[in-house]
Each structure stands twice: as structure tokens, then as C-alpha cells.
């Protein structure tokens, strides 16, 4: 489960910041938080990983927004607000559960759209069109000009249903 969580963290950050390096850096940040089993400030994380505090904060705040790290807020003796970050098994479990829920919703809507209508596919560029779109284009792909072919959705629906059921077991 930890590997799946680390994969989610890495890919989410890499996608958001359009940088695989940031994704790998986020993975290191959460691995550190998980392995240390303690709450750490962003400054402490930056020092331990030898990276800038600004990068650390940016990554941690994005992960917090996604619910991929835990955060605690406390007031120091000099009345400053200090945030400490942590990753534990509960955070990992909840993050994976939330991702599974989102995936199930997307698969469910895809199954619904496939069962409600007929679809046509271009055999050359593999673009998919609804019946209305195919009629509007005269049965010809607007991208490459190839004749569109009707597609039976039964196999796709079966695959999606199996994927939905496997996610349901999580």
C-alpha cells in the first residue's frame, strides 16, 4: 500500500508542477515524513533533505490540498503559528481510499455513457465519436478523412465493470 501511495504522490506532484523532478522530490519528502514517524516543520524537512524551504512548502501545501499528508497547526511561545507535517498509515489509507473513490466515479460515468449511446471510431487515428457527431461529419473522420466504423461497447463495458469491481474490493 505504501508503494501505491508513493506513486500517487510522485505522479500528482509531477503532473501539477509539470516536472518529474518535483515528483521525485515530493516522493523523498513523504518517505522522510513516513520513515521518521514524527511531526516535522517544513524548515526541518528542507534541512534534512538539503532543499530550499520554498520548494518544501510548495510541495507540502499541494499535498495537503490533495489530502496526501497530514498537518498540525500550533502556536509557539512567541505567538507564531507553526505547521508540522506528518505521514502515517492512516494518512496513506485515507489517500488511497479517496483516490479509489474518484476512480470509481469516473469509471461509473464512463460505463453510463457507453451504455446510453452508440459510438463510432476512426480506424486510422482512433478518435471516438457519438452517433450525433458521426452523423454531423457524414460518417467521415474530420481529422484524417477515413470512414468511421461502428463499435460494439460490450467488451469495453465488461472491462470497465471488472475494473470497478476490483476497485470496490479496496
From Swiss-Prot:
HTH TFE/IIEalpha-type domain: residues covered: 1-93
Alphabetized UniProt keyword annotations: DNA-binding, Transcription, Transcription regulation
Pfam family, one: TFIIE_alpha
Gene3D superfamilies found in the cross-reference section: Winged helix-like DNA-binding domain superfamily/Winged helix DNA-binding domain (1.10.10.10)
GO biological process, one term: transcription initiation at RNA polymerase II promoter
SUPFAM superfamilies: Winged helix' DNA-binding domain
Leader sequence segment: none
Molecular functions (GO terms): DNA binding
Family statement: Belongs to the TFE family.
Function according to Swiss-Prot or TrEMBL: Transcription factor that plays a role in the activation of archaeal genes transcribed by RNA polymerase. Facilitates transcription initiation by enhancing TATA-box recognition by TATA-box-binding protein (Tbp), and transcription factor B (Tfb) and RNA polymerase recruitment. Not absolutely required for transcription in vitro, but particularly important in cases where Tbp or Tfb function is not optimal. It dynamically alters the nucleic acid-binding properties of RNA polymerases by stabilizing the initiation complex and destabilizing elongation complexes.
Assembly and oligomerization: Monomer. Interaction with RNA polymerase subunits RpoF and RpoE is necessary for Tfe stimulatory transcription activity. Able to interact with Tbp and RNA polymerase in the absence of DNA promoter. Interacts both with the preinitiation and elongation complexes.
Xref: HAMAP family: TFE_arch
Entry remark concerning the domains of this protein: The winged helix domain is involved in binding to DNA in the preinitiation complex.
Protein name in UniProt: Transcription factor E
Amino acid at each position: 500500500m505504501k508503494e501505491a501511495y508513493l506513486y500517487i504522490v510522485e505522479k500528482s506532484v509531477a503532473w501539477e508542477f509539470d516536472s518529474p523532478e518535483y515528483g521525485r522530490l515530493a516522493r523523498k519528502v513523504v518517505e522522510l515524513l513516513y520513515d521518521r514517524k514524527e511531526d516535522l516543520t517544513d524548515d526541518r524537512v528542507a534541512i534534512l533533505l538539503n532543499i530550499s524551504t520554498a520548494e518544501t512548502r510548495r510541495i507540502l501545501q499541494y499535498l495537503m490540498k490533495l489530502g496526501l499528508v497530514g498537518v498540525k497547526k500550533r502556536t509557539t511561545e512567541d505567538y507564531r503559528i507553526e505547521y508540522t507535517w506528518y505521514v502515517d498509515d492512516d494518512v496513506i489509507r485515507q489517500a488511497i481510499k479517496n483516490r479509489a473513490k474518484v476512480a470509481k466515479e469516473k469509471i461509473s460515468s464512463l460505463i453510463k455513457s457507453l451504455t446510453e449511446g452508440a459510438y463510432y471510431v476512426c480506424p486510422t487515428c482512433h478518435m471516438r465519436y457519438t452517433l450525433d457527431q458521426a452523423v454531423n461529419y457524414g460518417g467521415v473522420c474530420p481529422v484524417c478523412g477515413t470512414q468511421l466504423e461502428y463499435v460494439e461497447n460490450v467488451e469495453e463495458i465488461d472491462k470497465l465493470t471488472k475494473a470497478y469491481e476490483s476497485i470496490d474490493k479496496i
